């Protein structure tokens, strides 16, 4: 169901990580924002802190059941772990919502 969109997200993340990662290494920076809601289908923010990843998900209507949403979120974690070459236990997530 969401596999085609995951490929789009994967491609975007690879492109951004290549560019920003190279720039950060050159400048000796370990903490930076990698992704900030670039694609509307992925309302998340990804920040790198050395070997740790902080993922913020923006709460919004997504039209998915809770079960499908959990599968989607797990798939997002897998894509991030694959591209950054980290295990998923180094990815910390939070749901952000308006008060």
What are these regions, as identified by a protein language model?
Residues 1-52, 58-60:
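Non-catalytic accessory regions of SAM-dependent methyltransferases
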Residues 5, 9, 68-76:
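Short amphipathic alpha-helical segments
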Residues 39-41, 66, 70:
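N-terminal, helix-rich and Lys/Arg-enriched segments in bacterial and organellar proteins
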Residues 45-47, 71-99:
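Non-catalytic substrate-recognition/targeting regions of SAM-dependent transferases
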Residues 52-55, 74-76:
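Short, low-complexity, polar/charged sequence segments that are solvent-exposed and flexible
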Residues 57-67:
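A short interface-forming secondary-structure element
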């Amino acid at each position: 169901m969401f596999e085609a969109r995951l490929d789009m997200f994967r491609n975007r993340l690879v492109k951004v990580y290549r560019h920003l990662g190279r720039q950060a290494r050159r400048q000796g920076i370990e903490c930076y924002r990698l992704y900030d809601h670039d694609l509307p289908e992925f309302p998340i923010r990804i920040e790198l802190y050395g070997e740790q990843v902080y993922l913020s998900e923006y709460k919004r209507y997504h039209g998915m059941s809770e079960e499908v949403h959990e599968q989607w979120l797990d798939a997002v974690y897998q894509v991030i772990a694959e591209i950054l070459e980290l295990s998923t236990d180094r990815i910390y997530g939070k749901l952000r919502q308006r008060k």
